[in-house]
Amino acid sequence: MNNLINIKEVEAKLNFTFTQPKLLVTALTHPSYRNETATITEDSERLEFLGDAVLCLIVTEHLFLLFPSMDEGTLSTARAALINAVSCCQYTDALGLGEYLLIGKGERIQNERGKTSAYANLFEAILGAVYLDGGLAPARQITVPLLPSKKDILPLMLGNPKNRLQQLTQKHLRTLPVYQYEPWTSPQGASGYHIRVLVNHEVWGEGFALSKKEAEKLAAQQALDAHDYEDKNTMDL
């Protein structure tokens, strides 16, 4: 057993006691630490792989039960936001587990991006370890309280305007929006984009911005606003 980890402290934060504490140690062992430590033979990567699937199942089930009227596409949009690296990093922070990560000297976390990746992987690995040791129930008990409230999940479900417009046109018109691009110059003289979004050859919205992505977003939002689309999925709130 690794003497650098206070198993009891970590278990207290998880509110879960391992029957196989070695699983927890492995989950906390970054691959870089194993590479630099001759006595360590296992790292967190396999548990991370398992934990990713466990997290996906738990979040899918949670959303399915919480929003019985939501369609599959909208649920998928919310799930993606709840299981991405940024969210998993936040779960690690919320549990206060980051300080227990065993990481190699050559792999010290240098910036926010590095922290997000390392902490996200850590959460998934711990979830995989909990699942192997105690099954789905304790993994669910750890995860669900970390998820946003029902009210806060709704904006995640709506997604960005492009996705919402695509879902709308597919569902109601069985077609996809088409984006047309033209060069545009801002009042300050900067080069940008003028984008029109067409549905069934009809212009639904326009957007002007310096970046193509932002102009598309503005055009899609104008299309949604102009057609006064009321998302029926809000009935679940």
Curated annotation (Swiss-Prot):
Keywords: Cytoplasm, Endonuclease, Hydrolase, Magnesium, Metal-binding, mRNA processing, Nuclease, RNA-binding, rRNA processing, rRNA-binding, tRNA processing. Homodimer. This is Ribonuclease 3. Residues 7-135 form the RNase III domain. Its EC number is 3.1.26.3. It is found in: Cytoplasm. Residues 160-229 form the DRBM domain. GO terms for biological process: mRNA processing; regulation of gene expression; rRNA processing; tRNA processing. Digests double-stranded RNA. Involved in the processing of primary rRNA transcript to yield the immediate precursors to the large and small rRNAs (23S and 16S). Processes some mRNAs, and tRNAs when they are encoded in the rRNA operon. Processes pre-crRNA and tracrRNA of type II CRISPR loci if present in the organism. Belongs to the ribonuclease III family. It comes from Chlamydia abortus (strain DSM 27085 / S26/3).
